[in-house]
Amino acid sequence: MSVPVAPFSHLSTLWVQVTGTWCNLQCVHCINSSGPTDPWLKSLDTETVKRHVMEAEALGVKEIYFTGGEPFLHQDILELLACSLRVAPSTVLTNGTRITEKTADALAALAGESLYSLELRVSVDDIDPEANDRIRGKGAFDKAIRAIRLLHARGLLPILTATEILQGDGPEGNGMYQRFRDLLASVGVTKPRVKIIPVFPAGRLAQEGGGPPDPG
């Protein structure tokens, strides 16, 4: 029996695990067991990332995503975003803890001068700060909400990203989306955006004894 072969026509999406598994949090459900110590996957150097972005451009890439680990731990993340935004719409998946006013200003400037759109997904796993921090680490909730407010104030319309299994219901159950929309409205976000994603039984969630330290 022959297996059908689909011809390669173009690259749809480029995912860049820019800081490998290096992260300042150690979330209990992290699919690749990222954390602050001894990352099993190292960060990518700046020139390597730029080279792959250019290769992706030649292959017709339509979207570029930066993930980790925590992308904002990379010392050249803004430079890398400037590079990717010349090629395709770009998205950063972040815990938000490293986004300061200065960083938010720089991101807004990048978005304003770029041909393509910049999107930021900020992870929050519960509307209750204590419940969220049991999952993500002490202080993570307040820092993530601050990041969302900073980005929103600059017109960047960040997406709050939550994991459905930790809410105890599916994405349509018990008003999960509305709970997060209400949370965003309560902190002054006038155009709330919420994305619910599944949690996979892999990485730290599949291990015993994994737990979140304080964010650095």
PLM regions and their residue ranges:
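A detector for short, charged/polar N-terminal pre-domain segments
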Residues: M1-A6
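Canonical Radical SAM [4Fe-4S] cluster-binding loop centered on the CxxxCxxC motif
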Residues: P7-E47
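Hydrophobic faces of well-ordered beta-strands that scaffold small-molecule active sites
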Residues: L14-V18, I64-F66, S90-V92, L118-V122, ...
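Canonical radical SAM enzyme core domain
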Residues: T37-R51, P71-G112, L120-K143, T163-G175
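Short Fe-S-cluster ligation motifs
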Residues: R51-T67
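Generic structural signal for hydrophobic
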Residues: A56, S84, I148-L151
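Radical SAM enzyme [4Fe-4S]-AdoMet core and its adjacent flexible, acidic
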Residues: S123-D125, P129-G216
